[in-house]
Amino acid sequence: MWNLSNKKAQLMERPFIFIFTLVVASLVFIFGFYVINNLIKTSSCAQIGVFYTDLNEQVNRYYNFDAGSSTDVQLRLPKKIKYFCMFSKEEFLDKTELDKINTGLYDVFTRVDENIAFVPVGYCPKSLFYIGKLKPKENPLCILNTGKVNFVLENKGTFVEARKK
């Protein structure tokens, strides 16, 4: 009925098969988790690029309108981005406001040539951008991200001003 010599060998082999299966399954799980996290982060970074493109189009559109023209802007951002900031290096930059958001942000803003930042700054490889015709009413103008960012753009003749709603 049972061949004892084969059964003994099979019993010795079975734990190794189970261990090997567990190791392979855990490696597949870890690799899948890593790939999915990277895809989600890449998607969020792409959404930042779309946000920048949409904002740049709005600024260019209202720059070409008459002085005093304004619009409410509502753009979407990924939840991992805490703040959307606009700043001008040409005017006084309020260090205390930036320190409330993130310590060290003032140093980052004073060293770059861009005027738009997504905080945390290092979340995406490209989190600093420049729109030449855009100036904030407050310096810096940082808006808390709730999934959507709301602010007003107004043509001031030589530039487009951004302010909180």
Q: Where is each model-derived feature located?
A:
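N-terminal leader/signal peptides at the extreme start of proteins
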Residues: 1-10
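Long, compositionally biased, intrinsically disordered regions
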Residues: 2-3, 16-165
